């Protein structure tokens, strides 16, 4: 049995959310909307309303704060996500994780595929699973295909941390949470992360907590 919001047309759901104003409430793990494949965007939401919704996603992402947000995370099962990362990290973290600034991007109907055999494993978290982080091994490079908010085609290769963000947010649109791909022995509270595992890579955590990392890219 679905929740009442499941039966509301997408455009009406978006209108309801935007009527409140300010950052949108973020849906937590356990809500069915996070476990269903999102509906591809094909004009179900009128252009002016869609533009407002994208801006609300951006505002909510900044307020959280986070580096990405998918529409299902605010209760809208639409295949749309936003990403942006100012990458305010020390140089050693930037180098180890390949974390470079990313401008604001809107991803409409995105999909990705690996661009090479490399894998990279790092701690990551999720706004829908607050308070926790875990190590996830992901493709080191991916080819993203999508459209932007203006309907222009996107076909681009992302590497390093931007590739991780693309994978994380696109996974949301397929009903997949990062914990589905995580090494669960690495699961750590934010407090434990700050106290014990703030190093640029998770090698020390892997040794202490007893989990394996993929090859040299880890």
UniProtKB/Swiss-Prot annotation:
Active-site feature positions: 169
One Pfam family it belongs to: Pep_deformylase
EC number: 3.5.1.88
Binding site for Fe cation: 126, 168, 172
GO terms classed as biological process: co-translational protein modification; translation
Residue runs in coiled coils: none
Catalytic activity reported: N-terminal N-formyl-L-methionyl-[peptide] + H2O = N-terminal L-methionyl-[peptide] + formate
Enzyme type, top EC level: hydrolase
UniProt cofactor note: Binds 1 Fe(2+) ion.
Keywords: Hydrolase, Iron, Metal-binding, Protein biosynthesis
Domain of life assignment: Bacteria
Cofactor(s) needed for function: Fe(2+)
Family: Belongs to the polypeptide deformylase family.
NCBIfam families linked to this entry: PRK00150.1-3
PANTHER family: PEPTIDE DEFORMYLASE (PTHR10458), PEPTIDE DEFORMYLASE, MITOCHONDRIAL (PTHR10458:SF2)
Function: Removes the formyl group from the N-terminal Met of newly synthesized proteins. Requires at least a dipeptide for an efficient rate of reaction. N-terminal L-methionine is a prerequisite for activity but the enzyme has broad specificity at other positions.
Protein name: Peptide deformylase 1
Gene: def1
